[in-house]
Swiss-Prot record:
Cofactor note: Binds 1 pyruvoyl group covalently per subunit.
Residue positions where Pyruvic acid (Ser) is found in the record: 25
Catalytic reaction annotation: L-aspartate + H(+) = beta-alanine + CO2
Cofactor: pyruvate
Location within or outside the cell: Cytoplasm
Entries under SUPFAM superfamilies matching the protein: ADC-like
The protein, known as: Aspartate 1-decarboxylase
Record-listed substrate binding positions: 57, 73-75
EC number in record: 4.1.1.11
Assigned protein family: Belongs to the PanD family.
Pathway(s) where this gene product acts: Cofactor biosynthesis; (R)-pantothenate biosynthesis; beta-alanine from L-aspartate: step 1/1
PTM comment: Is synthesized initially as an inactive proenzyme, which is activated by self-cleavage at a specific serine bond to produce a beta-subunit with a hydroxyl group at its C-terminus and an alpha-subunit with a pyruvoyl group at its N-terminus.
Lineage: Bacteria, Bacillati, Bacillota, Bacilli, Lactobacillales
């Protein structure tokens, strides 16, 4: 049996742009994709923290070091510039692989620069976890 598990996550990144007249996807700074172990063109789930929208798209690598998070095409209607989003990619594992699996969780600062990468998310308030 296969189990779907969190593979990589970019937590509370700020939407820098939303481009409606663009072929669909989300453009993400390549530094963030690599830190989270997410590939270009990989299917991802996006959750908008500000409005609660959840949707799926795929990634396009953005320029390194820019902090770029840009929703493109129809996905641009699901967010507003300045919103905080959570971007997640998943993988399917065999049951015997689940016990040893650890996702990559990337926390970013206000400029979408990598602040911390961990393989563990403890339950708690953001202020308690990040500081």
């Amino acid at each position: 049996m296969k189990v779907t598990m969190l593979k990589g996550k970019i937590h509370r990144a700020k939407v820098e742009q939303a481009e409606l007249d663009y072929v669909g996807s989300i453009t993400v700074d390549m530094d963030l994709l690599e830190a989270a172990g997410i590939y270009e063109y990989e299917k991802v789930q996006i959750v908008d923290v500000n409005n609660g929208n959840r949707f799926e798209t795929y990634t396009i690598a953005g320029e390194r070091g820019t902090g770029m998070i840009c929703l493109n095409g129809a996905a641009a209607r699901c967010v507003s510039t300045g919103d905080k989003i959570i971007l997640m990619a998943y993988c399917e594992l065999n049951e015997n692989e689940v016990k040893d699996h650890r996702p990559k969780v990337v926390f970013v600062d206000d400029n979408n620069k990598v602040e911390r990468v961990t393989s563990y998310e403890k339950h708690g308030r953001l202020s308690d976890i990040i500081l």
